[in-house]
């Protein structure tokens, strides 16, 4: 308990310090600095708010007990406040529990069709729409950065950014990070004339997005830049002039495309930012793997057997193999109703972190 009190005191002190800095006109005029402070302020605010409620509830409970000693009519107030104090204590403990340091960050997601040809590309498109619909419902902003479509309008590969509309402790990373891996689909493809169920797959990569384009630190000699015409349709919200950019990182072989912006210069800057995010993620995974804390990388191969989740169309069932989650509401999940699934994954992550802390 004493450790928790000390931690809360430190957080309150930091929170008040940030509040003072944000009130400084000079800081307010520096957009980059103000954005960073706002982000940290949003991370701390729920802890400070719940702690204030808890302090008040404890004081009210102490007063009610004292009055109940003199007048039993106040016992009902004691009975009301005791569970409230317990609830707030649990809520505060949950807020103080170890968290992923990137949870408040925006993300970039890449979706790639895997084994299964045209059917895999159509499924990759289904995944993209699922994430976009979920983002709309959950209050995240999203934009398509690059899109390579198949002949039937599926997705060969696609990159999307997801951002919080306002700084939040629970940013896009806190929910979308669980989507990295191989997703498997079982259904009758539109290209199948015999009505046979087939299995195909799509891969999803998720990584935090750098806050500033200025943070890109990639040597020009390590990249090859190609310019091409976008393949996206007008309705996809991507540019269709000859300004699309493809950047290949020669040391790693990573390839990033961007066609969202209206000029080659803007698309190159955005693609470099995405590439930096991927390189940062690779470096993070290498460090964590060395420390023995990292699970298997998100997508080692596009093999259908290496899957994190299966989408079974005939049975309307979704299965997450990491936590044994099963639900017969695939149709609603594909419509963006992913909250139950994500909360189950978050609960498992919290349990694992608490266990690791001992």
Curated annotation (Swiss-Prot):
A matching Pfam family: RF-1
N5-methylglutamine PTM positions: 236
Any one Gene Ontology cellular component term annotated for this protein: cytoplasm
InterPro entries with a match to the protein in the record: PCRF (IPR005139), Pep_chain_release_fac_I (IPR000352), Pep_chain_release_fac_I_sf (IPR045853), Prokaryotic/Mito_RF (IPR050057), RF-1 (IPR004373)
Locations listed in the record: Cytoplasm
Superkingdom of origin: Bacteria
Post-translational modification note: Methylated by PrmC. Methylation increases the termination efficiency of RF1.
Principal location: cytoplasm
Keywords associated with the record: Cytoplasm, Methylation, Protein biosynthesis
GO MF, one annotated term: translation release factor activity, codon specific
Residues annotated as transmembrane: none
NCBIfam families registered for this protein in UniProt: prfA (TIGR00019), PRK00591.1 (NF001859)
PANTHER family noted in UniProt: LD18447P (PTHR43804:SF7)
Family: Belongs to the prokaryotic/mitochondrial release factor family.
Purpose of the protein: Peptide chain release factor 1 directs the termination of translation in response to the peptide chain termination codons UAG and UAA.
Protein's UniProt name: Peptide chain release factor 1
Originating species: Corynebacterium aurimucosum (strain ATCC 700975 / DSM 44827 / CIP 107346 / CN-1)
Gene symbol of the encoding locus: prfA
């Amino acid at each position: 308990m004493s450790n928790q009190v000390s931690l809360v005191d430190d957080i309150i002190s930091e929170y008040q310090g940030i509040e003072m800095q944000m009130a400084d006109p000079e800081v307010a005029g520096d957009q980059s600095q103000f954005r960073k402070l706002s982000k940290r302020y949003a991370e701390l605010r729920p802890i400070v708010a719940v702690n204030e409620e808890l302090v008040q509830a404890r004081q009210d409970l102490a007063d009610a007990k004292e009055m109940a000693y003199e007048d039993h009519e106040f016992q009902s107030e004691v009975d009301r406040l005791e569970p409230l104090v317990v609830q707030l204590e649990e809520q505060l403990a949950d807020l103080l529990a170890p968290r992923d340091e990137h949870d408040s960050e925006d993300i970039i997601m890449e979706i790639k069709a895997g084994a299964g040809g045209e059917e895999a590309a159509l499924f990759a498109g289904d995944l993209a729409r699922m994430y976009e619909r979920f983002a709309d419902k959950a209050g995240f902003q999203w934009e398509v950065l690059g899109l390579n479509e198949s002949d039937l309008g599926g997705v060969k590969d696609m990159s999307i950014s997801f951002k919080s509309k306002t700084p939040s402790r629970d940013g896009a990373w806190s929910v979308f990070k669980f989507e990295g891996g191989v997703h498997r689909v079982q259904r009758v493809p539109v290209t199948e004339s015999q009505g046979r169920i087939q299995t195909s797959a799509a891969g999803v990569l998720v990584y935090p997005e750098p806050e500033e384009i200025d943070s890109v630190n990639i040597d020009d000699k390590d990249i090859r830049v190609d310019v091409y015409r976008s393949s996206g349709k007008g309705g996809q919200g991507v540019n269709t002039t000859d300004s699309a950019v493809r950047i290949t990182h020669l040391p790693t072989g990573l390839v990033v495309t961007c066609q969202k912006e209206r000029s080659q210069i803007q698309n190159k800057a955005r693609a470099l930012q995405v590439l930096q995010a991927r390189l940062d993620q690779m470096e993070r995974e290498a460090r964590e793997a060395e420390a023995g804390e990292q699970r298997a990388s998100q997508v080692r191969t596009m093999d259908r057997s290496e899957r994190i989740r299966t989408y079974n169309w005939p049975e309307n069932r979704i299965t997450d193999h990491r936590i044994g989650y099963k639900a017969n509401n695939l149709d609603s999940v594909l419509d963006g109703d992913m909250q139950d699934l994500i909360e189950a994954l978050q609960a498992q992550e919290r349990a694992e972190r608490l266990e690791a802390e001992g």
